[in-house]
Amino acid sequence: MSITSVASVFKGDFAIGSQITVRGWVRSRRDSKAGISFLAVYDGSCFDPIQGVVPNNLENYTNEVLKLTAGCSVVMTGEVVESPGQGQAFEMQVTKVEVAGLVEDPDTYPMAAKRHSIEHLRELAHLRPRTNIIGAVARVRNCLSQAIHRFYNEQGYIWVSTPLITASDTEGAGEMFRVSTLDLENLPRTDKGTVDYAEDFFGKESFLTVSGQLNAETYACALSKVYTFGPTFRAENSNTSRHLAEFWMVEPEVAFANLDDAAKLAEDMLKYCFKAVLEERRDDLEFFAQRVEKTAIERLENFVTSDFAQIDYTDAIEILKACDKDFEYDVEWGIDLHSEHERYLAEEHFKAPVVVKNYPKDIKAFYMRLNDDGKTVAAMDVLAPGIGEIIGGAQREERLDVLDARLAEMELSQEDYWWYRDLRRYGTVPHAGFGLGFERLVSYVTGVSNIRDVIPFPRSPKSANF
């Protein structure tokens, strides 16, 4: 006898007549007049629960089985049989039910209701994985994570663990969480009256990272092809469906590569991930197509068969100006494209994923390679129908004199980036990479529009519960 997952039963890994044991939680119990009960038990391995047909001759039928309610945990043993009902091929003829844990008060159990709003579930983040939607999101998120690691491993990339604590601001935006052990009631001061961070734990101002990119570049300039995949932090006071204070980023960096190479890598990676989720999590995608976004599957299938359109930022501005769309934000050369502009390009103009390249330097970071026109940098955004920007990347500035000039323009200290400048002094090399906001990817795949619902415990302004 073996303990097995519900998913493996539905895959047909066990022949009819096999004795199995399933461990999980009760989704529902239904009693028949014939003296049997039907337990729907799920273990999180797949979307559907398995049905256990429980006879009333079990020892604990009256005093335990008939007390089972949604959320109770059980160990259910029995025989695999063909299911006469529609919806699943197999069920269990149960010979033993062990109750691991009861729900104290079924009437007040928060997950007992048939359906909660997804907004309400955020207040119950410790229990929401028990719902169909958040369980499905978790499995899709896992599938995408595994696909990303597989993709880069198969391509010969090395995974680099970049630090979460840093003294560098990758974006130059200043919206960073400070890390300090100083006594806030008794801050040490310099002669000028400013906080003396020399007395702090790291001996200088330190922050939670906004990106692993700069650190990844150091390894790319020695190991050729690397990537990071980990949490990043932004102290933006933004309460929108697209922003989190803590989120995960995928950031590849490639030596001897240019912007076109980065664009091709982004396309290959996205298509690989979407193919994986279409193959491996079809049951969850069917749920999302039924309950959340009816085009969820169709959208992914179209994506993996589409050629990415490519366009310069300047040409994109002209397209936006020429269209008869009434945008909320005015369109002119030099603006950072807003979501409405991005979605028009991807959904209405090109009707396909699109890579917008060569943005004005004044709206991009210091490390992006300055183009020959002196006005634009070799930056790109990948725009996807249905969401807009999903990836941002660039060829990095490998020329020390140009990098120093850009640092000066943005009033950033060469001293703070001395190690980053060293890469340009000792065997500099053209290199490129990009960043993918992982939660936006999960949101795109599932159709769940608020990224607070695609990360287990969302962190946002005034919200750090659990």
From Swiss-Prot:
It is found in: Cytoplasm. One of its GO terms (cellular component) is cytoplasm. SUPFAM superfamilies: Class II aaRS and biotin synthetases, Nucleic acid-binding proteins. Its EC number is 6.1.1.22. Its main location: cytoplasm. The keyword Cell cycle does not apply. InterPro entries: Aa-tRNA-synt_II (IPR004364), aa-tRNA-synth_II (IPR006195), aa-tRNA-synth_II/BPL/LPL (IPR045864), Asn-tRNA-ligase (IPR004522), Asp/Asn-tRNA-synth_IIb (IPR002312), NA-bd_OB-fold (IPR012340), NA-bd_OB_tRNA (IPR004365). GO terms for biological process: asparaginyl-tRNA aminoacylation. It catalyses: tRNA(Asn) + L-asparagine + ATP = L-asparaginyl-tRNA(Asn) + AMP + diphosphate + H(+). GO terms for molecular function: asparagine-tRNA ligase activity; ATP binding; nucleic acid binding. Pfam families: tRNA-synt_2, tRNA_anti-codon. It comes from the Bacteria. Keywords: Aminoacyl-tRNA synthetase, ATP-binding, Cytoplasm, Ligase, Nucleotide-binding, Protein biosynthesis. The keyword Protein biosynthesis applies. Belongs to the class-II aminoacyl-tRNA synthetase family. Homodimer. This is Asparagine--tRNA ligase. It comes from Shewanella pealeana (strain ATCC 700345 / ANG-SQ1).
